[in-house]
Amino acid sequence: MNGFASLLRRNQFILLVLFLLQIQSLGLDIDSRPTAEVCATHTISPGPKGDDGEKGDPGEEGKHGKVGRMGPKGIKGELGDMGDQGNIGKTGPIGKKGDKGEKGLLGIPGEKGKAGTVCDCGRYRKFVGQLDISIARLKTSMKFVKNVIAGIRETEEKFYYIVQEEKNYRESLTHCRIRGGMLAMPKDEAANTLIADYVAKSGFFRVFIGVNDLEREGQYMFTDNTPLQNYSNWNEGEPSDPYGHEDCVEMLSSGRWNDTECHLTMYFVCEFIKKKK
């Protein structure tokens, strides 16, 4: 009987516990009031700010932004290497007919001809040969006179004239010397201005003048071996000679000087000293 009563009380306790758990799960307290009503009278405030978290991993690369404004012009770079030779340009217009050239060299002897009639021509052959030489010299002199008549410039001490035959620098030197002059040497501003005006009014762009550094690289001299001590009129940035081949000098129609390659051909100016009376 006692054992049955003990079992009954235990079962009642278990049922009471289950009942209380059921009430709690339904949101009711012991007084059968909804839990929500109890919580509604209390204000839930946020807690204090937590510590900074660890730095996260880098995000993905963003999209490209808009192109910015163009920056200022940079400093001029160093001179680059010489490029490959360009393509051959279009053929230029046909120039005006030039003067008749000088007599060329003798050709290869031809085949022996047939025997001719007997003639006592020995005394004439020497005369004919000398006549041919005289005619060749006369043609050369006439060409020189023609150039001089076309226009000269002069100062109190010198004559200047433009030779309108394209020659390289050494040929120009020889041409002037054979005729008793030299390539023009503008040793002061007055002479330089006179020659430049002469070139410009003749309709030319550039001519050889008597200045070079053929004897010693970088040390420019007049053709009479005097240095450029008192006067020179180099163009801006000249003499440049980036590859070591520009040893001769040209004058532009502006009067400025440029160093240039000696093998180029162009017109040139000779100067002659006036004979004292």
Swiss-Prot record:
Effect of residue 176 to W: In 3MC3; severely decreased secretion
GO MF assignments: chemoattractant activity; D-mannose binding
Biased composition (Basic and acidic residues): 49-64
GO terms under biological process: cell surface pattern recognition receptor signaling pathway; complement activation, lectin pathway; cranial skeletal system development; positive regulation of opsonization; proteolysis
PROSITE patterns: C_TYPE_LECTIN_1 (PS00615), C_TYPE_LECTIN_2 (PS50041)
Signal peptide: 1-27
Cellular compartment(s): Secreted; Golgi apparatus; Cytoplasm
Disulfide bridge positions per record: 176-270, 248-262
Protein's job: Lectin that binds to various sugars: galactose > mannose = fucose > N-acetylglucosamine > N-acetylgalactosamine. Acts as a chemoattractant, probably involved in the regulation of cell migration.
Name of the molecule in the record: Collectin-10
Organism (species): Homo sapiens
Taxon lineage: Eukaryota, Metazoa, Chordata, Craniata, Vertebrata
